[in-house]
Structures are given as structure tokens and as C-alpha cells.
């Protein structure tokens, strides 16, 4: 699975605050556009929430967000999105071009 920044989460780019959570939402909305989204259920988590991977035009939205630098591979649950994260990190794409807290660290600090 993946994790994404919280809507209120900000990052720092060259000393300026950037709304990285809002940007993550925007690039996902832009990617989906008016296309149909197909989700494949992968079961439930410990809190009984549905886990699913969603696709638009046969492209994984999870992979897209991670490769765009606005999603992070949940390494303890899956290795699937690590190559996408490595690509974004190596190329300093999205949040990897900024100073940021991982979403799980951001939530813990709230």
C-alpha cells in the first residue's frame, strides 16, 4: 500500500511553505479527470477499512502518486511501490524536492 500527505500538511521548498497535501489531492483529481476509476479490493485492515488499489485507464493511481513524489510506499506491508518511490526520490520529484515529514510522522506529531 501507500500513504499520502494529509490535506493540511505543508512542506518547505527553498524556505517557503508549500501545501503538499493539497497538491497531492490536485494531481490525483487532475489524473482522474472525467475518467472512470476501477478499484480492486485487497481486503480489510486492522480497523476494518477496505484496502483497494484503484486504476484509471489501467494505470495504478497508487503508483502514479508515488512516482509523482506525492505518495510513499508502505514498506512494512508491501514492496510493490518501492521502485516508484526510488524513482521519485532519485529524481527529486514532488515532495522529494522539498523538506517534509513523512505522513505517518506528521500525524504522530498532531
Residue ranges and their predicted role:
Residues 77-110:
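N-terminal targeting pre-sequences for secretion and organelle import
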Residues 72-76:
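Short, polar/flexible loop-turn hinges at active-site or ligand-entry regions and domain interfaces
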Residues 1-70:
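Electropositive
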Amino acid at each position: 500500500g501507500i500513504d499520502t500527505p494529509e490535506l493540511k500538511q505543508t512542506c518547505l521548498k527553498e524556505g517557503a511553505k508549500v501545501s503538499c497535501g493539497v497538491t497531492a489531492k490536485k494531481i490525483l483529481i487532475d489524473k482522474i479527470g472525467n475518467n472512470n476509476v476501477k478499484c480492486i479490493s485487497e481486503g480489510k485492515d486492522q480497523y476494518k477499512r477496505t484496502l483497494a488499489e484503484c486504476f484509471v485507464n489501467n494505470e495504478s493511481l497508487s503508483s502514479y502518486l508515488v512516482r509523482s513524489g506525492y505518495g510513499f510506499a508502505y514498506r512494512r506491508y508491501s514492496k510493490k511501490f518501492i521502485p516508484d518511490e526510488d524513482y521519485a526520490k532519485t529524481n527529486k520529484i514532488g515532495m522529494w524536492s522539498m523538506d517534509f515529514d513523512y505522513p505517518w510522522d506528521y500525524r504522530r506529531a498532531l
